[in-house]
């Protein structure tokens, strides 16, 4: 583990956060929502940049989540299983304007699940900030067709068997 690597990662996260701060400045974002676990770091940076709380949907209800929850099922293509994703009703209300944040967008199941959670709460989805979108997979197109505004900061057209990325 190197502090130089950690510092570089944090600087990148802060740059991503600033891009989303600028892109969604007029949308009165009140909360940021991501899904555990890989999106948490960039969502936290975005929350700091925007000065708003960050929520993360848990992949299953745990004993430290009291009371009612909003829940949905999200299929993980990476792990080949379904997760019952939850967020506490205490933290998301119809008065919120929510920015969804995640590190990758591929098939779109995680992002669609986050949309479902926000819709259950009656809150407004202002859009999604995505670090890397795999454009050769259908998630981004499907979600845009549903009307979701997506701000992807890197868009990958293809990945070759030889490791090449376009």
List the predicted regions and their residue ranges.
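Conserved acidic residues
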Residues: 30, 96, 126
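Conserved G/P- and acidic residue-centered "switch" motifs that form tight phosphate/ATP-binding loops
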Residues: 103, 108
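Short, small-residue-biased leader/transition segments that mark boundaries at the very start
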Residues: 1-7
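Short glycine-rich phosphate-binding loop at a beta-alpha junction
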Residues: 29-36
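PRPP-dependent phosphoribosyltransferase catalytic core
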Residues: 113-166
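A short, well-structured juxtamembrane/interface segment
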Residues: 9-29
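Short, glycine/charge-rich flexible loops or terminal/linker lids adjacent to PRPP-binding catalytic cores
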Residues: 52-98, 164-166
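Short Gly/Thr/Asp-enriched flexible loops that form oxyanion-binding sites at enzyme active sites
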Residues: 41-50, 115
């Amino acid at each position: 583990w190197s502090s130089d690597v950690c510092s570089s990662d944090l600087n990148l996260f802060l740059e991503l956060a600033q891009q989303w701060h600028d892109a969604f400045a007029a949308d009165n974002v009140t909360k940021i929502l991501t899904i555990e676990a890989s999106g948490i770091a960039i969502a936290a940076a975005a929350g700091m940049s925007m000065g708003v709380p960050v929520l993360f949907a848990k992949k299953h209800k745990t004993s430290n989540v009291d009371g009612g929850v909003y829940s949905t099922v999200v299929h993980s293509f990476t792990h080949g299983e379904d997760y019952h994703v939850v967020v506490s009703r205490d933290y998301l209300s119809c008065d919120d304007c929510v920015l969804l944040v995640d590190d990758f967008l591929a098939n779109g199941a995680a992002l669609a699940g986050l949309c479902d959670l926000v819709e259950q709460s009656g809150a407004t989805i202002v859009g999604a900030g995505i670090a890397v979108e795999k454009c050769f997979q259908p998630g981004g197109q499907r979600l845009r067709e549903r009307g979701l505004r997506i701000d992807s900061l890197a868009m990958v057209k293809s990945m070759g068997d030889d490791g090449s990325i376009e």
